[in-house]
Amino acid sequence: MNTYLSEITNLIYYINLKEVCMLYNNIKSYLLSGITVILLTGHPVIAADNVSKPDNKSQTAYLQHPPDLRPFSIFDYYLDNMFEHKLSAYSSSAIRTKFITQDKQYILVLEVPGYDKSQIKVKVNSNKLFITGNVEQNNKSEASDDYTKRNFNYVVSLYEDVDQNNISSNLKNGILTITLPRIEVKEKDAKEIPIQ
């Protein structure tokens, strides 16, 4: 075991990930028995107590092994992201968008299946375009009390050259198309600020 500890201390400043993997494979039986090597999280480097005294008989090495060598690390992704994803197919993240730039206009396309014109609102205010959709269905019957609610909200910052008075929108076959006409914007003169 002391040869492995001395090997760890000799590699303190010259270690890389590949060497850590090889070293871990050499000493993993000792790690599993928990004799002298302590696993910690932190930076992927190796450090040891009393490095300046190599003849010291009681050395403790700290080793962080790569994540792919940790037991149960395959579950980290699923456990970390368990509550971040919504199960609804109609969540706001499920709505696909596309922004098209043309010479005389911008076109914003949103895929909003299942929404009709009365359930979608498009508003413009202070160089921002607000697009909201809301569906509430109450399907009461003798067999069940089903209630469905789904919505989305998008806010788009408009460029300076968008003619906000002539924006138009169209909904057809679950595709919302918003046309943003462009106007010529005169470049403002720069104002020089004197340095005092």
From Swiss-Prot:
Q: Which Pfam families match?
A: HSP20
Q: Which GO terms describe its biological process?
A: response to heat
Record has Phosphoprotein as a keyword = no
Would the keyword NADP be found if you checked this record's keyword annotation? no
* InterPro entries reported for this sequence: A-crystallin/Hsp20_dom (IPR002068), HSP20-like_chaperone (IPR008978), HSP21-like (IPR044587)
Q: Which UniProt keywords apply?
A: Plasmid, Stress response
Q: Output the CDD domains linked to this UniProt entry.
A: ACD_sHsps-like
Q: Which residues form the sHSP domain?
A: 88-196
What family does the entry list?
Answer: Belongs to the small heat shock protein (HSP20) family.
Q: What is this protein called?
A: Small heat shock protein C3
